[in-house]
Amino acid sequence: IYSSLRIEANALSLNEVRDVINGHVVLGSQKEIQEVKNAYAAYEKLDQIDPYSMKDLKWIHGIMTSFLVQESGEFRRGEEGVFDGDECIFMAPPARMIPHLMKELFDWMKENKDTIHPLILSAVFHYEFVFIHPFSDGNGRMARLWHTAILSKWKPVFSYLPVESQIEKFQEGYYKAIADCHIAGESNLFIEFMLEQFDRILDEVTVQLRSSDENISEYVKRLLDVMEYDVPYTAKSIMDLLQLKSRETFRKNYMNPAIEMNLVVMTVPDKPQSRNQRYIKK
């Protein structure tokens, strides 16, 4: 909830979001506080949603935008676009086309849900939904919630995976993938982007499970915390991130145990002391 709202520029902190959800008094924009209440109420309905029902989509949008917009729970009746200052960089389809386009999208999902993999189908829906921009407000929040709804109907574990948090982390890439798809006229780049995010999420979950199962040392945990996925690091750059000066301490306590547990791999495994050696977090 916090991450999905942050993507939409809600300024409340994580602690403030928690306080709102727990019914505590929070000093802040009433609109932003209402957004938190609405998003929490919408996500509470996740297990009741039929992701292939347009009626349910409008129902959840009504919850997500309650007390915030006049057209809550209804498709927009006005025209919408994305602007960079005074320049329109994307114009959504005309309002008169929304019912037809949304029916086509939901019909396509129903027809293909048993033949197209849910990870791909949900990403296609996410992009097409953002492109159609069916509501006057809340389209981004609804797209991300519905993405989760489709996947959690397939595998309930997806209702617990931090999809929105991952998108927030790679927010620039998220919007770039959408913009590139607008130009290309297809959703392939967005599908690839989302699959990469799920791959990262599952890697992180795997590490967390290993951490609890194998009692990873605090040294290795610190090492993994400072390393990003798929980024090749030199030993010196990692030592700088860890604020270490002793190469022996670094090897003995941090890097060697991580390599032994297959949490970090070497780019030149047959020559551990190579000057070209780099380390990549798995």
Annotate the PLM regions.
Residues 1-282:
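FIC/Doc superfamily catalytic core
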